[in-house]
Amino acid sequence: MSNWLEKIIPGMGGAQSKHKSNVPEGLWKKCPKCSAVLYRPELEKNLDVCPKCQHHMRISARRRIDIFLDGADRMEIAPELEPADRLKFKDTKRYKDRLVSNQKATGEKDALVAFKGTVAGVPVVAVAFEFNFLGGSMGAVVGEKFVRAVNVCLEENRALICFSASGGARMQEALISLMQMAKTAAALEVMKQRGLPYISVMTDPVFGGVSASLAMLGDLNVAEPNALIGFAGPRVIEQTVREKLPEGFQRSEFLLEHGALDMILSRNQLRRRLSMLISKMMKLPEPEFENEEELEEEEMERPEPPDNVE
């Protein structure tokens, strides 16, 4: 287009290109639900929730940890763990090559990050799935890191919060992956016997072996609005039963209505609500927010959550 303009009006194409190059890339983002064009700095300030339609966009595991935990006194748990291709698995691509490409793309060694820290002064361990790493699938490293996070809770009397975003068990690790379902469930049973709270926060999406194990084993099962949660996907179910599924089937609002969830919390409510719940469950002092007036002001500025949001 610029070459065509250059021929008709000399200098026009070059000027247009120069002007375009001054606009930073990635400054705007389109909402995948309502198609609103959003200014990225404002979107990030709103915790990656669309101010127009309240759509909760998918975020990285570290971004999740950053907006949930307090800024000080954080420590990553088992960052040294790396996956291994024990089965020498190959489908259309070698598993080893998939691991390398996903590690480069995400900056993570595997699909789970774990930190101990505080939420408004309440001591916790928080783990979050990285969906962009092989669909957040659960393999040996994910299971081991989850168990190590549980062990920190047992050693230091902390609550555990898990933010799930996963397609399920990692097929490239076969039975090793399926074993993680039992391994993580057994670790959570020890937490339960010790009376330490485990809060599962399901984000979009949660499926397969993760939804069938650690994601649904919380003392409180929480979800973000409109998250897709289930075992098999809705299209697979429709093809199997050959029936049209109800509107909103497998969305968090549908699950809450039918008793599969305890509550739905919008992203800007998670820190305050969960820290208050944990402090009551563990009989700890009330959470300490730095400036109560600023907190209330922030909440007033943020858009109202949709219906069915606690």
From Swiss-Prot:
Region described as Disordered: spans on this chain: 285-310
Cofactor(s) needed for function: Zn(2+)
Keywords carried by this UniProt record: ATP-binding, Cytoplasm, Fatty acid biosynthesis, Fatty acid metabolism, Lipid biosynthesis, Lipid metabolism, Metal-binding, Nucleotide-binding, Transferase, Zinc, Zinc-finger
InterPro entries cross-referenced by the UniProt entry: AcCoA_carboxyl_beta, Acetyl_CoA_COase_Trfase_b_su, ClpP/crotonase-like_dom_sf, COA_CT_N, Znf-ACC
Cofactor binding note of this UniProt entry: Binds 1 zinc ion per subunit.
Domain of life: Bacteria
Residue spans, zinc finger C4-type: 31-53
Subcellular location: Cytoplasm
Enzyme class of the recorded protein, top EC level: transferase
Residues binding Zn(2+): 31, 34, 50, 53
GO molecular function per UniProt: acetyl-CoA carboxylase activity; ATP binding; carboxyl- or carbamoyltransferase activity; zinc ion binding
Full protein name: Acetyl-coenzyme A carboxylase carboxyl transferase subunit beta
Native source organism of the sequence: Hahella chejuensis (strain KCTC 2396)
Gene: accD
